[in-house]
Each structure stands twice: as structure tokens, then as C-alpha cells.
């Protein structure tokens, strides 16, 4: 027999009255965490873009309205797949193309919408941030990128 009765409004699964103050407190906490995380992601994005400007072979493709946790960049002249594997050697994991086309060998629709040609799409990587990422990790990414011209062959001039 059940320990408590009632809850017909919840298919007899949740008897009793909701703890409205606890629900409101939980919602406020989630909202606060969301704002804090969103600001952190925006800070990471801004730092990434600032650092990318230091490199003549790295171009940021993400402009206008965008998710602050995703950035698409082109390594001018270097195949994205080669850069991806090079970064993996240092424990840096990225993706090629856009999330919309991650399982497709065709040119990314998202990059195409940005006006990217095949060469740009071939040389692009997608970087995703998490609220646990740090500025120091972005700096490490660019430290590794300084070695790309010495270690990878340019496929495009």
C-alpha cells in the first residue's frame, strides 16, 4: 500500500503540494548559474578572437549573432583535417566543419551560408567552449598554433 495518498493531478504519482518556495529558489539558482556561465563563455570567445588576430594564417569566420561557445576558424593554406590531428597530439580536440555537417563529407551548409568556398571549408575547424574551459587553455591552444607553420605542409598557397 502507498505511503501517501493523493496526487491525482499528477497521475497519482506525486501526492501532496509542491514546495513553491523551494521551486522558486531552485529556478533563481539556475538562472544565476546560467548568467554566470554565459558571461564566462563570452569572455572566452572574446579572448580567443583577440588572440587569433595575432596570426596571419588564422581567420575567424564567426560573426554577428552567434553562440558564444562555438567559433569557426580557418587556417589559411592548411587542411583542417591535418591541423585537427596536429592539435590532437597536444591533447587539444576540435572538430572539422560545422556541427550541422559533422557526419557528412559534403561542404558544410553553415560555412556555405557564410559565403565560404571549398578551400575555406577544407581549411576550417570548429572550436567549442565549455563553462569549465579557461583563458589559460586558449593561450595554450595558440601556443601550439605558433608551431603549425614549422610542422605542417601548406596545401594551398
Language model features with spans:
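Pyridoxal 5′-phosphate
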Residues: 1-157
Amino acid at each position: 500500500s502507498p505511503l501517501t495518498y493523493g496526487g491525482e493531478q499528477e497521475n497519482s504519482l506525486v501526492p501532496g503540494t509542491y514546495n513553491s518556495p523551494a521551486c522558486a529558489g531552485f529556478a533563481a539558482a539556475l538562472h544565476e548559474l546560467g548568467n554566470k556561465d554565459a558571461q564566462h563563455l563570452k569572455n572566452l570567445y572574446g579572448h580567443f578572437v583577440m588572440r587569433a588576430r595575432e596570426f596571419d594564417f588564422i581567420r575567424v569566420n564567426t560573426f554577428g549573432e552567434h553562440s558564444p561557445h562555438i567559433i569557426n576558424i580557418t587556417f589559411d593554406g592548411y587542411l583542417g583535417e591535418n591541423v585537427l590531428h596536429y592539435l590532437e597530439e597536444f591533447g587539444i580536440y576540435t572538430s572539422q566543419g560545422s556541427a550541422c555537417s559533422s557526419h557528412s563529407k559534403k561542404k558544410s551548409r553553415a560555412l556555405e551560408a557564410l559565403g565560404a568556398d571549398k578551400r575555406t571549408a577544407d581549411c576550417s575547424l570548429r572550436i567549442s567552449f565549455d563553462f569549465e574551459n579557461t583563458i589559460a587553455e586558449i593561450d595554450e591552444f595558440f601556443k601550439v598554433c605558433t608551431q603549425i607553420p614549422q610542422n605542417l605542409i601548406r596545401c594551398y598557397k
